[in-house]
């Protein structure tokens, strides 16, 4: 179900990013990193890079500034008796791994089986992004999203499946591109009832 606060782009806020102030010690840390790589932070092309990088990372990790559970505060009880699976497939997201701070790029499938109320569809994506925009590991991200929906909506079941590629594997270390990692968390009937589990996995496209 959509609500009046759902944005046309599926829940993402659109607009220019404000130029937040960057503390001197943060900018200097990035200058130090540039020097360590072998480049000169004082050359023309890199003069503004420390500020850009600092602001970019503040944006990449803006999930720390919010409680994703708040997106589930508003629910709808008048749903015409609907009591079947609600599923959002292929929600794109970006995160960064906590080990190398390398990009994690993927998509999530989020489903729940409502008990007596539903939530606006963009709110599921907002929960995902609230946790993804932090330093993460995919396993924890999957669990956090599922647990948040389970605790916030008290549905009969929750299923979260995440598929992602990891920069720490594709561009460093074993340098193996094209590898996708899949994680899942099933709760309630999707964990305990084989028929319900098969149904939701089939809808996701993994049955």
Give the positions of each predicted feature.
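A domain-level signal for the structural core that forms small-molecule/cofactor-binding pockets
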Residues: 1-207
